[in-house]
Amino acid sequence: MSEMPTPVNFTEAAASKVSGLIQDEGNPELKLRVYITGGGCSGFQYGFTFDESQAEDDTVVEKDGVKLMIDPMSFQYLMGAKIDYLEDLQGARFVIENPNASTTCGCGSSFGV
C-alpha cells in the first residue's frame, strides 16, 4: 500500500462530491477507485467505482478525509492528472485532465497515449 504524496491532483471539489455520495450510501468504508480500461473511441476509458477494499499495491490519494485509490496499471496513465468535479451548463460530472493523453474524444471519457 502506497500512501506517499503522488503526482495525482484530487481536487477539493471532487473530494467534497465523493464525500456526499459516500454519506448517501451510508457506508463510511467506501473509497473512490479510479481506473483505466481498454475501449472508447480513443483507445482507453476512465472508470469510477466505489470500493471498500484497498489492495496492497494501490496508490492512495487522500483529500479532506476522502480516499481515492488507483491500481498500478492505471496509475502509470494517470500520473500528473487532475481529478476534478465540475457543475456547469453541460451538467455535473467528474473530469480528468490528463497530461499523458495525446488524443481525447469529444466527451472526454476516453483517451489515447
Swiss-Prot record:
One example of a Gene Ontology biological process annotation: iron-sulfur cluster assembly
SUPFAM superfamilies hit by this protein: HesB-like domain
Cellular component GO terms held in the UniProt record: cytosol
A Pfam family matched in the record: Fe-S_biosyn
Co-factor remark: Binds 1 iron-sulfur cluster per subunit.
GO function terms (MF aspect): 2 iron, 2 sulfur cluster binding; 4 iron, 4 sulfur cluster binding; iron ion binding
Tagged with keyword Amino-acid biosynthesis: no
Signal peptide: none
Entry cofactors: iron-sulfur cluster
Keywords associated with the record: Iron, Iron-sulfur, Metal-binding
Residues that hold iron-sulfur cluster according to the record: 41, 105, 107
Alphabetical list of InterPro entries matching this protein: FeS_biogenesis, FeS_cluster_insertion, FeS_cluster_insertion_CS, FeS_cluster_insertion_RrpA, HesB-like_dom_sf
Role according to the record: Required for insertion of 4Fe-4S clusters for at least IspG.
Quaternary structure and interacting proteins, as annotated: Homodimer.
Family note: Belongs to the HesB/IscA family.
HAMAP family: Fe_S_insert_ErpA
Protein name: Iron-sulfur cluster insertion protein ErpA
Organism: Hydrogenovibrio crunogenus (strain DSM 25203 / XCL-2)
Protein's gene: erpA
